[in-house]
């Protein structure tokens, strides 16, 4: 079904592995389309509790747009963003399930944007992020201008975007670009720990949190108070909420089913 990525679902985890190692997992039009389709499939699959996004190999998560593959396209850059990149980023931000990025290597250009669109980024210490758009006379896209200032503030966002410099793991964690940085040898274990947590978490509650937090970025207090009330009312009717409350009263660990 997929030619440019590997999609697997096991034990509540949907794993998307970008699989174009010969070009450092660069984003061709076909790969972008497949990522969007895979995220949509994970959203529709009730057995999926958490989504993992990573790249094949140990050198690159994603090196950004495949410029050679795009040369044969008649589509303008703006149309390419509107019809391909933007739907991919929107799918990641709106799936009502947590998205974990295993940042195993370089994440450059739109590859950096792709990583920043995830809910949790676990990064190898020797990997790096770079918004290298400026190096070819372009501005950051694929959501980077939205995510970056909200993560690190406007002044630092401008510095990173206007220089395109590399931000390695330790600095990325220090300035808030990523949530966790570990040694390369510990990356898989750290990722699996995080996946284990989320696949046993109350999935619908996590999805409601994600939706509310997304909306809070461009909303006001009154709107968010109403959003919280509506969300809590719906969650109060779920099986997971019933299980969570009962487990609390019985002083035991809850057994969530994602329902």
Where are these regions (language model features)?
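Glycine- (often His-adjacent) and acidic-residue-rich active-site loop
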Residues: 55-91, 107, 135-137, 220
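Hydrophobic alpha-helical membrane-association signature
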Residues: 31-34, 84, 114, 187, ...
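Terminal low-complexity tails and localization/encapsulation signals of metabolic enzymes
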Residues: 1-2, 246-259
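Generic structural signal for alpha-helix termini and adjacent loop/cap motifs
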Residues: 21, 45, 73, 95, ...
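Short, charged, surface-exposed hinge/linker loops at domain edges
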Residues: 210-219
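Crotonase-fold acyl-CoA enzyme core
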Residues: 90-206, 230, 234-238, 242-246, ...
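Conserved CoA-thioester-binding segment of acyl-CoA-metabolizing enzymes
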Residues: 1-54, 90, 188
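Terminal peptide-recognition signature
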Residues: 16, 20, 34-35, 53, ...
């Amino acid at each position: 079904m997929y030619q440019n990525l590997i999609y697997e679902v096991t034990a509540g985890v949907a794993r998307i592995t970008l699989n174009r190692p010969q070009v450092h997992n660069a984003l061709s039009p076909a790969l972008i389309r497949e990522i969007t389709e895979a995220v949509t499939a994970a959203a529709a699959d009730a057995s999926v509790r958490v989504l993992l996004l990573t790249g094949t190999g140990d050198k690159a998560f994603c090196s950004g747009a495949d410029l050679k593959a795009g040369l044969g396209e008649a589509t303008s850059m703006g149309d390419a963003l509107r019809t391909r990149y933007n739907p991919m980023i929107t799918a990641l931000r709106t799936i009502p399930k947590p998205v974990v990025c295993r940042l195993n290597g370089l994440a450059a250009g739109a590859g950096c944007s792709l990583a920043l669109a995830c809910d949790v980024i676990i990064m190898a210490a020797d990997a790096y992020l770079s918004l290298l758009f400026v190096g070819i006379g372009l501005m950051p896209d694929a959501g980077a201008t939205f995510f970056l200032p909200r993560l690190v503030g406007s002044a630092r966002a401008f510095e990173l975007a206007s220089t395109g410099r590399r931000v390695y793991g330790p600095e990325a964690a220090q300035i808030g670009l990523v949530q966790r940085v570990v040694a390369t040898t510990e990356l898989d274990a750290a990722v699996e720990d995080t996946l284990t947590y989320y696949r046993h978490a109350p999935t619908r509650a996590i999805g409601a949190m994600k939706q509310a937090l997304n909306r809070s970025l461009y909303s006001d207090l009154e709107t968010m108070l109403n959003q919280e009330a509506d969300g809590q009312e719906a969650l109060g009717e779920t099986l997971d909420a019933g299980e969570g409350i009962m487990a609390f009263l019985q002083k035991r660990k809850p057994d969530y089913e994602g329902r």
